[in-house]
Amino acid sequence: MSKEKQAQSKAHKAQQAISSAKSLSTQKSKMSELERATRDGAAIGKKRADIAKKIADKAKQLSSYQAKQFKADEQAVKKVAQEQKRLSDERTKHEAFIKQSLSSMRTTASATMEAEEEYDFFISHASEDKEAFVQDLVAALRDLGAKIFYDAYTLKVGDSLRRKIDQGLANSKFGIVVLSEHFFSKQWPARELDGLTAMEIGGQTRILPIWHKVSYDEVRRFSPSLADKVALNTSLKSVEEIAKELHSLI
């Protein structure tokens, strides 16, 4: 039996005893018991109510916590989904970047392979000497199997002239320089000669001068260092003879 029921039972018995008491002292004694039982019952009832209130408060707190936790879980799931989407988008962008980079690398590699094509001879000349000598020399060398960097054959529409010539200079074993009055008056062939000279100093190539209708004094005035080099002379040898001597060097 619970304490509350025990207190109620005592109060009931005390009430009955008061009704049946024959003496005043017995009534007073039972009245005291009734008061104690009533107080005990009230205290127990209050305590039970307090406990019930606490339980209700805890239940309310639990419900509130569960609601907050549910909302937090929803937000966490949403954040995870957003993060997964972000990672997926980043991965997609990264894959696209890698594909683009690979494509660029392939293009660069292809261009590099083309740029690194090697030649036996680079021919530096003035355009005015093409028909009179250079074209025939190139044809004779090609007939002998030599690989020539010659603008009429090597340069294509859209090519960068300066870059292609720099590539030709860098990837040729020998630099043939056709020295003529036209050559001496041109800036572009002179730049090519500067490039060949720098490479010869670096041990990367050799300059092979050909004198075309010029004298020693004219060459010396243009470049004393070239005048001292052993040269082939179009006034002394035919195109075929010059081509054979040049081809013998490779």
Curated annotation (Swiss-Prot):
Record region (Disordered): 1-46
Show the GO cellular component annotation of the record: extracellular region; host cell plasma membrane; membrane
Q: Where is this region: Necessary and sufficient for phosphoinositide binding?
A: 1-117
Signal sequence: where?
none
The first-level EC class reads hydrolase
Q: What is its EC number?
A: 3.2.2.-, 3.2.2.6
Enumerate composition-biased segments (Low complexity).
14-23
Q: What is the effect of changing residue 236 to A?
A: No longer inhibits TLR4-mediated activation of NF-kappa-B
Domain description: The TIR domain mediates NAD(+) hydrolase (NADase) activity. The TIR domain crystallizes as a homodimer. The TIR domain is a structural mimic of the TIR domain of host TIRAP. Whole protein and the TIR domain (residues 120-250) abolish the interaction of host proteins TIRAP and TLR4. The N-terminal region is required for localization to the host cell membrane while the TIR domain is required for tubule formation.
Function of the protein:
Virulence factor that interferes with host Toll-like receptor 2 (TLR2) and TLR4 signaling, resulting in the reduction of dendritic cell maturation, inhibition of pro-inflammatory cytokine secretion and impaired NF-kappa-B activation in macrophages. Interferes with host TLR4 signaling by abolishing host TLR4-TIRAP interaction (but not host TIRAP-MYD88 interaction) and its downstream signaling. Inhibits host TLR 2 induced NF-kappa-B activation and TNF (tumor necrosis factor) secretion. Binds phosphoinositide (PtdIns) via its N-terminal domain.
The protein here is known as Probable 2' cyclic ADP-D-ribose synthase TcpB
Organism, by scientific name, is Brucella melitensis biotype 1 (strain ATCC 23456 / CCUG 17765 / NCTC 10094 / 16M)
Name of encoding gene: tcpB
